[in-house]
Amino acid sequence: MIIVTGGAGFIGSNIVKALNDKGITDILVVDNLKDGTKFVNLVDLDIADYMDKEDFLIQIMAGEEFGDVEAIFHEGACSSTTEWDGKYMMDNNYQYSKELLHYCLEREIPFLYASSAATYGGRTSDFIESREYEKPLNVYGYSKFLFDEYVRQILPEANSQIVGFRYFNVYGPREGHKGSMASVAFHLNTQLNKGESPKLFEGSENFKRDFVYVGDVADVNLWFLENGVSGIFNLGTGRAESFQAVADATLAYHKKGQIEYIPFPDKLKGRYQAFTQADLTNLRAAGYDKPFKTVAEGVMEYMAWLNRDA
């Protein structure tokens, strides 16, 4: 069995899909379906069982067994960069992750987990997986950074695989439940389909991010499980492309629309990553050599998926 925490969420459900594509269906999905809309991410996927996150954590802390577990993909976390409840964030992201990590170490179960590019904070260059480059801007980034630091202490003595992925700006299918935290491509598509003008912040040609397609993210996760490599790795494309490029690709698919530029909100000033670009040196050195989709390629594929029933 493979366990996917956050398996009804964005990246988790895409990992489930990637496993299904390889014929793997003996999957336990762990999630919190208090947000009932997330179930739609699983309706076209095949899993063996579902468990609520709280019940799962109780069983993990009690040392209960789940049968023959081949790996745990730990994607379950609070991923809102605008959540400032530090106790909630540390319980949900840091303590929960530590419990799972030790459960896996004791049983030598491969543990593959979601870190984040938010660990780098407001950098504009040198997004390198090393302590001197890490200075998170928000409590979400701090919770991810602290767990990475914890893992670094354990890695040298670990007898089983531990791998963390610093996801950059992931977009693609199955993110609709994320609301305001969904990608720009998702929001632009929604606005266009409502007959509204698609909106970007003023200066969007200067805001550049490493936008990585979720299908590529799932592929990297599965490659690492198959190859047993440990460590903490950036997971982006290695390219910085502008929000304007995302909008251009969206409009190219729809063949209509005119961008409306809106003022940059005061509440995000100083807390907003204006530039991200993954340094892929370590990922490539680990042996992962597949290409990543460009914004033009990924957004076109995503638009086709979003509008598949149109």
From Swiss-Prot:
The active site is at 140 (proton acceptor), 178 (proton acceptor). CDD domains: ADP_GME_SDR_e. GO terms for biological process: ADP-L-glycero-beta-D-manno-heptose biosynthetic process; carbohydrate metabolic process. Substrate binds at residues 169, 180, 187, 201-204, 209, 272. Keywords: Acetylation, Carbohydrate metabolism, Isomerase, NADP. Its cofactor is NADP(+). The modification N6-acetyllysine is found at residue 267. Its EC number is 5.1.3.20. SUPFAM superfamilies: NAD(P)-binding Rossmann-fold domains. NCBIfam families: heptose_epim, PRK11150.1. Catalyzes the interconversion between ADP-D-glycero-beta-D-manno-heptose and ADP-L-glycero-beta-D-manno-heptose via an epimerization at carbon 6 of the heptose. Homopentamer. This is ADP-L-glycero-D-manno-heptose-6-epimerase.
